[in-house]
Swiss-Prot record:
Sorted UniProt keywords: Cholesterol metabolism, HDL, Lipid metabolism, Lipid transport, Repeat, Secreted, Signal, Steroid metabolism, Sterol metabolism, Transport
InterPro entries for this protein: ApoA_E, Apolipoprotein_A1/A4/E
Segment forming the signal sequence: 1-18
A biological process from GO: cholesterol metabolic process
Record-annotated disulphide pairs: none
Classification via SUPFAM superfamilies: Apolipoprotein A-I
Region named 10 X approximate tandem repeats: 64-262
Entry's localization field: Secreted
Protein name in UniProt: Apolipoprotein A-I-1
Sequence repeat spans: 64-85, 87-107, 108-118, 119-140, 141-162, 163-184, 185-206, 207-228, 229-239, 240-262
Length: 262
């Protein structure tokens, strides 16, 4: 039991001495605090697991004391971290104030470098423009020569193509006439065949047409024969009635004339 307690004590002591604090910079101090907190938490967890292995009947009181000691150690670490916070902020302020002069010197050097480099930049631009102009002068004749060569080649190609195009145009006209000459017999054959078929149809339809014509003439004659008596009868009936109506109208007119004179 004493050996276990001694081992825990040595472990905790080693843990507290494992990360010496350095005051190099605020970031370093923060790293130390974070590492110390993490290490203490791991030590507490390991020790608690070891304590849990002890028999509650025999070591109950001792387990409670060790657990309390671990809690006190955690609280001490938290209090230490909080107590270091003002020193960390103060150190950061001191560091900022201490480096103000250095930062001012750096900014001054940057401005001086900018002032010194501005003419150099103009000189560099001038040199680059000069080199580009030299390259342009070297390349421009070659480019012009290439363009002229292509233009000459195009002119030569056009000169070669013009007579061929004219020849093809003349051949097209001749070929059209030749095609027409070959096509006309085919057209005449088709036309003759169509004419023949039409004549055959006309020949086949002629008897039917004559028969239909004769039937129409016969029907018209029959209608005329049937209508003629009716027409004469109607005329005979209408004639006397029309004469009577005429006499009545003349008498009515005479009566009105006499009345107007009186």
């Amino acid at each position: 039991m004493k050996f276990l307690a001694l081992a825990l004590t040595i472990l905790l002591a080693a843990g507290t001495q494992a990360f010496p604090m350095q005051a190099d910079a605020p970031s370093q101090l923060e790293h130390v605090k974070a590492a110390l907190s993490m290490y203490i938490a791991q030590v507490k967890l390991t020790a608690q697991r070891s304590i849990d292995l002890l028999d509650d009947t025999e070591y109950k009181e001792y387990k409670m004391q060790l657990t309390q000691s671990l809690d006190n150690l955690q609280q001490y670490a938290d209090a230490t971290s909080q107590s270091l916070a003002p020193y960390s902020e103060a150190f950061g302020t001191q560091l900022t104030d201490a480096t103000a002069a250095v930062r001012a010197e750096v900014m001054k050097d940057v401005e001086e470098l900018r002032s010194q480099l501005e003419p150099k930049r103009a000189e560099l631009k001038e040199v680059l423009d000069k080199h580009i102009d030299e390259y342009r002068k070297k390349l421009e004749p070659l480019i012009k020569e290439h363009i002229e060569l292509r233009r000459t080649e195009m002119e030569a190609f056009r000169a070669k193509m013009e007579p061929i195009v004219e020849e093809l145009r003349a051949k097209v006209a001749i070929n059209v006439e030749e095609t027409k000459t070959k096509l006309m017999p085919i057209v005449e054959i088709v036309r003759a065949k169509l004419t023949e078929r039409l004549e055959e149809l006309r020949t086949l339809a002629a008897p039917y047409a004559e028969e239909y014509k004769e039937q129409m003439i016969k029907a018209v004659g029959e209608v005329r024969e049937k209508v003629s008596p009716l027409s004469e009868d109607f005329k005979g009936q209408v004639g006397p009635a029309a004469e009577q109506a005429k006499q009545k109208l003349l008498a009515f007119y005479e009566t009105i004339s006499q009345a107007m004179k009186a």
